[in-house]
Each structure stands twice: as structure tokens, then as C-alpha cells.
């Protein structure tokens, strides 16, 4: 399970987002701000993976304009909303890439999640470690398909099926890309943090990204 808020806390967060989306669809501005504050940081991290630091804010703003415009037509819970917004953001990012004629390398986002545990004793902690700002800065070293799969699953919080819908791929292909990307990120993080005395109990396995 690739979520950084586990168990009851995750359920509560999902319920809050689901309720806020429903209220925002009826014109509740406070609810919309709740949705934005909850979803935007990780959505922006995904956009950075696609277009790089320089244009990420502009592309994310375009995505939110469409999200706001089409919100009334959305149906579903928090999970579906995350997938829906990620699809919109990806489409806006690909439009931007077509305009500029190239896919820039992403930069790091130090605001998504902070802090690397001194030691990852469980798979969940290992996965959480891979979504720190330091890991985000290393994603530029991954192939594009692996980078997207990792960010959609480990940062945005989508399951394999939802991520596959965003990417237009089979869930199995997304699991494979995420698995390979996480393994490589774990290696890069191990190298990058060795001088700081940070260690990892081990890279995640294929089972961890299902």
C-alpha cells in the first residue's frame, strides 16, 4: 500500500476530502479551499515530474482552472478525485510539452514531504522515505515511465488501477514501472544519504507496490 497517511488517519482524510468535494460542488468556497490545500501540493509535485520546476506552477494553475470549471461534472470519492485531477494535470502538462517541443528534466520539490527516517524498519516506512524532497530531486534520473508511476503512486497516492487510468496503461505495467523506479530510487537515496549517516533496511519489493 503506497500511502503516507496510514490506517484510520488515511480513512479520515479521505472522508474529509470526499465531503469537501461534494460541498464545493454546491458552491461552498471554504470546502473548495480545503480540497485545494489537500490535493494541490502532491499534484504540483506530479506536474514538476512532467514539466520541471520553471513551468510547474503555471501548468498546475491551468489544471486547476479546468478542475474548477468541470467540478460539477465530477462523481466519486477522494480516490477518484485524486485520479481525476491527476489526469487533468497530465493533459495540461502534455499540452505544454508539445508547445515547448521537449520534455524538461524535473527538479526537486522539498515541500511535498519532509524528513527521512533514521532507519526504515517496515515497508511502509521505506516507501514513505522515497517520497521526501530529497527523493523527488532524484526522480530526474529515472526513465519517464518510472518517474510518473512512482510519483502517482507514492506521492499523489493512487493505487495501481487509478494510476493506470491516468497513464492509459495496464495496472500490471504501472506496478512494474513503480517497482523498478522505487528500487532505483532506493539505491540512489542510499548513495545520496550515506554521508549523512542515514540508512535503509532494504528496498521495497514487488509485493510492496501492489
What are these regions, as identified by a protein language model?
Residues 4-8, 25-33, 44-62:
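Short, charged helix-capping/linker segments at alpha-helix termini
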Residues 15, 21-45, 135:
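A short, charge-rich alpha-helical start-of-domain segment used by transcription regulators
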Residues 25-26, 50-53, 62-79, 99-101:
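Sigma70-family region 2
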Residues 26-29, 101, 117-152, 156-166, ...:
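Amphipathic alpha-helical segment used for protein-protein interaction
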Residues 90, 94, 98, 146, ...:
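DNA-recognition helix of helix-turn-helix
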